[in-house]
């Protein structure tokens, strides 16, 4: 084993990628503040101050008229009120929630090319009551994902309950394994998954991984992508973190998806990190929920993953190769409709679904979330 002195270990710890990024971004912010101060206090400052104030006023008027979450608008308006000279410029730099024009163009092209893969099959919603059928139509129209019968769902109340089932399903993979996560971090949980992925890739299974670069920044080595590609695991780090101020640096991929052979899918709030299975302790007991879907509705997750994958890699000629022929369909007494929200429009699909659930509730509604940050509309509905 290579011995490293305490000094070497110290500098290795402080000179990691995230520390360097934070320091460089902070220096850029300080430089911009100095430039702004120099401009607004030097020759021509009256004109510059007037232009910046006018910009801030226009941004406030735009936010007031914008169809947007009220808490989000109030936050920005308050910031602009506190910093009238810089508030408008800060909104232009960091307030845009839509993806870059290039990524938006690619995502739109992918969605158009594979729209038929989201077509609603006839008869799938026949057993729904009128209220639920309305929600289903809304999800089909705005979420662009169909509803399915012949699907079973299993709920896991915590990560350590879901983990063994996930490993067992990964071991059964014969054709494809698709994974998409916000956090992937080296440790017991990831090692168990990685061992299976490497073995399956060596057997010829199509294994692909998308992970958020910021969410996984502290948990993965620098050469992670190279190591995965060498093992024939195709890999995409979403929105790589760079030590430069960027208009899209806060655009992150928080989805947690696993799709196995197009037959079984996992989703929920559980990332691939040890705290999610309580193998380590961070902030006490870590409780996130998971969901296992088996049957026809797993197809929606396949389309979600491939749509996003194709925005960064060359188009798949068709998704039909990943659509399983289910000889025996699981029996079920309900309808399952997995859906994804889109950054390409202003429609708050997920929030609208929750509001509709609350509006229809007659006796009780159970919500579970480890993070509670809701806007006024949701608070009003809960009251």
Where do the model's predicted regions map?
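Helical hairpin unit composed of two closely spaced alpha helices linked by a short loop
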Residues: 371-383
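N-terminal localization/anchoring segments of enzymes in phospholipid and broader phosphate metabolism
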Residues: 1-356, 360
